[in-house]
């Protein structure tokens, strides 16, 4: 099935497109129902991982599913589930997101031409939608595999109520046992969802959705005689009422709550350290859509009360005073937008968002948005867009992994709101009745008040580290060219993307005030996604990704000073990890059965040629046997080749 995206809606046609063509502004939409032919790596289809095979989304190191969109940092991309923020969308190791795909209906990635109703992000918005329809009969979709198993249920109750439920549980012990010879890791995760849709007749449609996921990990590091335990979780709920006020006017009101919490306990010798961080959002959003003859208008309001625990450090040592601090804030916005087909060959979508943030300080910013589309013909169109975005909640990363040591900070006098100016210009051309298409989009982003953190978790635990003293506020820019070519018919679906880009940062107190590559900088990024159905029984698919290695700061020398090692560093982020690349393949045999709507056996191999893609680099002093010490660089590998087998059934 193929998806062709209009301005506001996805239209499903008879072709098999996995990824829709870009809409007005170059954004991307995915429909879960069209993903059956996608590679089932690890036995499951993951919509968040799929986004890494779309233009402008950089491939990350192994162990990381962070969204680096157009040179933005991980914390500059916001993920929304039915309108509620999902602050930690990845499980540890980066192999899965926290979302159970059968519970979803689709998503849209906004990276330019961002509607005025969305804010709180300076890079990109990923709006994910759960299933909302009245089911006609009871149904189950399940996947049983070696790494994880999941199931989703839909249950109609009468004609006006449908329940949806989903669950996923992992079997990762055999996988984590392969990660290190010096570390014993016990790791588990789970994802759970529950929702309903009720038809209230003339009063409208009421929907509810709740999501919970958790990660539990324990690591015994033998060489350091230490035990580390981690637990982090998301819990969010949304309640929405959609009402038709008139044949041309609809209103949607949503209440939501979202909580993210992470906890790290580290026991080394006789010292126990406890680190806790989190964020809680409680909000309301109302959007009114007015559909006139030729013009569509959206207006609305958004309010969020937010509580943030930046990072509590508690040590089980004598005379220790625990550091506990919780910050509160309010964020409100008024927004409006208009879609106006000014001429047969000119479409305009313009909007304005007025955002207000208050804690110890008050900030107010108008955020203009405009996109102009020029459809030259049904097969060729151009567009240009400008967005001004603000972000008041800031993520402070402390790890390259999808890990529980990152934390959030509210904007303050020392860390003012992040701002970004975003420009883009693109086109798309289609041929062969839409089966073949190619597109290109150039972008430029200028960022103010971006942050860089000069400490790591062990330094924080050691005590005496003041977060604000280790934070630097500066500016950045990113620019690039995204190109894509795709072909789809009833048997073949192929998408090839290439992005040439740079992302730079500049801080007065770092690198002598000179610009340096951002952590998200990837000069070259290539992705390939292909699927082939030689017969109704078989689906063969493959993905390939290549990206320039991530930047890091090299240790050039170690000195012994007193009772500690002193480091000498090279240029800040002046070195790069080896380039990342891997090929993944998947084969599914679909059985014909009178008892099941769909039943298939899948075999997949992640990283077929066992490429050793490093997560990070460390250094150690070693003896070369001649009574001389030398500095050794070590590349840490999480995993290489991962085979999996699973059975999928739907009835």
Predicted regions and their residues:
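Short, acidic, small-residue-rich periplasmic hinge/interaction motif at the N-terminus
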Residues: 1-39, 48, 74, 244, ...
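Short acidic/polar hinge/loop motifs at secondary-structure boundaries
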Residues: 37-39, 84-111, 187
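Gram-negative outer-membrane beta-barrel transporters
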Residues: 444-446, 467-556
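A beta-strand signature from Gram-negative outer-membrane beta-barrel systems
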Residues: 53-54, 98-141, 150-152
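Outer membrane beta-barrel strand-and-loop segments of large Gram-negative receptors
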Residues: 281-287, 323-335, 412, 416, ...
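Surface-exposed extracellular loop regions of Gram-negative outer-membrane beta-barrel proteins
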Residues: 261, 309-314, 360, 378-423, ...
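Extracytoplasmic beta-strand/coil segments of soluble accessory domains associated
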Residues: 39-43, 48-85, 105
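C-terminal beta-signal and adjacent terminal beta-strands/loops
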Residues: 537, 546-563, 580-582, 588-651
